Swiss-Prot record:
Membrane topology classification: Single-pass membrane protein
Keywords: Membrane, Transmembrane, Transmembrane helix
Gene Ontology cellular-component terms listed: membrane
Segments crossing the lipid bilayer: 26-48
Protein name from the UniProt record: Uncharacterized protein AF_2183
Subcellular location: Membrane
């Protein structure tokens, strides 16, 4: 029987936090794989049938997610206002222009990276088959427009999903919580979240633009 042997030279330069981090990654990967396998075994009897559910309920879940995202955005903007009011010396909106500048710089370099790749894809003789694949993909999409995008009746494709969303909004028995935690019809929660988003974004832009003279000299 061969005992476990560890080469100390390979490990003596590894910092403890780094080693713990690596072990944590290995542990999490094993945990996730084990969890997935366990779920597959538990749900195996129920996996005999293909997925099918009420289209209106499915669409309602989509809309509820949209409403929650709008509310989350509004709460984040509200947090910025509170931070700015709490620390009057923070000049929060003035400093946000520094983040804008950083984002513009990164976006500019990212555009150059993408342009370089696209230029090579367009001109390289070694990528002829890849260009052909792009053409075939567009042709495949064009010849299956109804399957992907749907039809005027909303019987298939994305049009069907949008039609079910309309039905979900028209069905006042489908409710969700609004920004104040009150249970209201889905359409009302969506309308309120949309109105709050517009209002908060306008206020945010006003505060941001007000800080331009101090940020840019």
């Amino acid at each position: 029987m061969t005992l476990l042997s560890i080469n100390y030279e390979k490990f003596k330069y590894i910092e403890v936090p780094e080693l713990l981090s690596k072990l944590g990654v290995v542990f999490m990967r094993g945990y996730v794989v084990g969890l997935v396998l366990a779920l597959m075994l538990v749900t195996a009897p129920a996996m005999a049938e293909d997925f099918s559910m009420n289209g209106t309920e499915f669409a309602a879940a989509f809309i509820k997610n949209t409403v929650s995202n709008l509310d989350l955005g509004a709460k984040f903007l509200h947090l910025l206002y509170e931070v700015n009011d709490t620390d009057t010396n923070s000049n929060l909106f003035q400093n946000l222009w520094g983040l804008v500048y950083g984002g513009v710089l990164v976006a500019g370099w990212n555009n150059q990276v993408t342009a370089e790749v696209l230029e090579t894809l367009a001109d390289s003789d070694n990528l002829t088959s890849q260009r052909t694949n792009i053409s075939e993909s567009i042709r495949m999409m064009a010849t299956n427009t109804s399957v992907v995008f749907g039809d005027t009746e909303g019987s298939q494709g994305l049009a069907a999903l949008m039609k079910y969303q309309v039905k979900a909004l028209q069905n006042t028995s489908i409710t969700t919580t609004n920004s104040t935690g009150v249970e209201v019809p889905l359409v009302e929660a969506y309308a309120e979240a949309l109105a709050n988003t517009i209002t908060d974004n306008v206020k945010f832009m006003m505060e941001l633009f007000k800080a331009i003279p101090n940020a840019l000299t």
